[in-house]
Amino acid sequence: MIPPRSLGSTAALLLVLLFTTLASAIKFDLPSNAHPHTKCIWNYALSDSLVIVTASVVAKEPFDFSHQRVDIEVVDGSQHNNVYLSKKAIKGETRLAINTHSHADLGVCFKNTLTSKSGNQIPVVTIDLDVDIGADAVDYNAIANQESLSGLETEMRKLEAVANEIVNEMEYLKKRELRMADTNLSTNMRVTNFAILTLIALIALGVWQVFHLRGFFKRKYLID
């Protein structure tokens, strides 16, 4: 019989994994413009993570795509500013797959360009975006069919992948914390050294002032 405490811990872990595996989905309208601004949807992703981007682009009635062009670009916010994919004139459902190179925010960016005017109205598209990262991007149904896994085994395989992602993220956070601690230590040492040098300089200046004034007073015969 499993102890109640173990059951509680297992349930808590499963709840954490469940909420961690939620995919990012959003739906929004994007009006066209001759000089369009770029709208980006950002999600954090670890390095070497599989990311599946599914974008459904539909022109809002009464417009079509004859007067507007939607471009998509997948980038990240790392210091390298990686551009993973760039595709122009997308319509309908577009599915993109990438592998990340850095621990950074991953941006899926859209731009709707007005190619020609259509009366006084501005053409608009509706974008339904779904971003799956890591374990959520893996097709476990295909794996289950290939390896003849049961439903429970498939779920356990998925939870195992999510748990590995959590471990990797915790390791990354630990390394980042160590780097920040090293930076703080280095900064504190520099501040301490600067304070010591400043104190030594003030003492040296004070000693010099004493000898200078002593010599001045002797020349003026104010002291012996």
From Swiss-Prot:
One Gene Ontology biological process? endoplasmic reticulum to Golgi vesicle-mediated transport
State where it is primarily located.
Answer: endoplasmic reticulum
Which UniProt keywords are listed? Endoplasmic reticulum, ER-Golgi transport, Golgi apparatus, Membrane, Protein transport, Signal, Transmembrane, Transmembrane helix, Transport
Q: What is this protein called?
A: Endoplasmic reticulum vesicle protein 25
Segments in the Cytoplasmic topological domain:
212-224
Q: Which compartments does it reside in?
A: Endoplasmic reticulum membrane; Golgi apparatus membrane
Pfam families recorded for this chain?
Answer: EMP24_GP25L
The entry's family comment says: Belongs to the EMP24/GP25L family.
The cellular component terms of Gene Ontology attached to this UniProt record, alphabetical and capped at eight, are: COPII-coated ER to Golgi transport vesicle; endoplasmic reticulum; endoplasmic reticulum membrane; endoplasmic reticulum-Golgi intermediate compartment; Golgi apparatus; Golgi membrane
Q: InterPro entries, per this entry?
A: Emp24-like, GOLD_dom
What functional role does this protein have? Answer: Constituent of COPII-coated endoplasmic reticulum-derived transport vesicles. Required for efficient transport of a subset of secretory proteins to the Golgi. Facilitates retrograde transport from the Golgi to the endoplasmic reticulum.
- Residue ranges annotated as transmembrane are 191-211
Q: Which residues lie on this side of the membrane: Lumenal?
A: 26-190
- Which cysteines bridge via disulfide bonds? none
Domain (GOLD) ranges: 38-131
User: Which residues, if any, are the signal sequence?
Assistant: 1-25
The annotated topology with respect to the bilayer is: Single-pass type I membrane protein
